[in-house]
Amino acid sequence: MPEQVNCQYDCHCSNCACENTCNCCAKPACACTNSASNECSCQTCKCQTCKC
């Protein structure tokens, strides 16, 4: 299984243009900031190149 840090959900970088079609968060560098609303922090994540 992919290693994740405090995050049961897929994270997306907010500055990724294709966040709706690509998971742009490089795991395991994502952490949930609010598990109730499923908000994740991509502070150390780098957005991958996405093709829409």
Curated annotation (Swiss-Prot):
One of its GO terms (biological process) is cellular response to copper ion. GO terms for molecular function: copper ion binding. The keyword Aminoacyl-tRNA synthetase does not apply. Sequence repeats lie at residues 43-47, 48-52. The keyword Ribosomal protein does not apply. Keywords: Copper, Metal-binding, Metal-thiolate cluster, Repeat. Induction: Both MT-I and MT-II genes are regulated by copper ion in a concentration-dependent fashion, and both are inducible by silver but not by cadmium salts. MT-II might bind nearly 10 mol eq of Cu(+). The metallothioneins are involved in the cellular sequestration of toxic metal ions. Belongs to the metallothionein superfamily. Type 10 family. This is Metallothionein-2. It comes from Candida glabrata (strain ATCC 2001 / BCRC 20586 / JCM 3761 / NBRC 0622 / NRRL Y-65 / CBS 138) (Yeast). The lineage of its organism: Eukaryota, Fungi, Dikarya, Ascomycota, Saccharomycotina.
